[in-house]
């Protein structure tokens, strides 16, 4: 069994999702870390501590994080990058290997279309997990990152077995 923590970073809301892989994906936990303050360094601390608590509680083996895409607003891109850095530091501080995926790569792995919108990602995550009701958008995005990583791991594993033959 492999347990993966997926992260959808944000400076105000950071989504997280944890999946176990036992031959099929199993939802362990999903939610959002809401920083709820205007003080930016405090937001980063809350992201770091929130991810740390999640790692300590659920003990994932690997972490997958969505990469920053270029914003039209440079300040927003910088803040997003710093929030992402806080999440990555929390994972690394707990000894997790961290894997990064572009948003387009995540959407392509889940929906089959790199330009899919958040609602399409949310729908596919719920469908794949057999969820009746929708998850929060940030949480479903984080689960999408975890799905993408599991898919990537499976592909590499299959290729490795083929090469050894």
Curated annotation (Swiss-Prot):
Domain of life: Bacteria
One Pfam family this sequence matches: RuvC
Annotated cofactor note: Binds 2 Mg(2+) ion per subunit.
Protein name: Crossover junction endodeoxyribonuclease RuvC
EC number: 3.1.21.10
UniProt main location, coarse: cytoplasm
Gene Ontology terms for molecular function: crossover junction DNA endonuclease activity; DNA binding; magnesium ion binding
Keyword Magnesium among UniProt keywords: yes
Active site: 8, 66, 138
Catalytic activity line of the entry: Endonucleolytic cleavage at a junction such as a reciprocal single-stranded crossover between two homologous DNA duplexes (Holliday junction)
Keywords for the protein's UniProt record, in alphabetical order: Cytoplasm, DNA damage, DNA recombination, DNA repair, DNA-binding, Endonuclease, Hydrolase, Magnesium, Metal-binding, Nuclease
Cofactor(s) annotated in UniProt: Mg(2+)
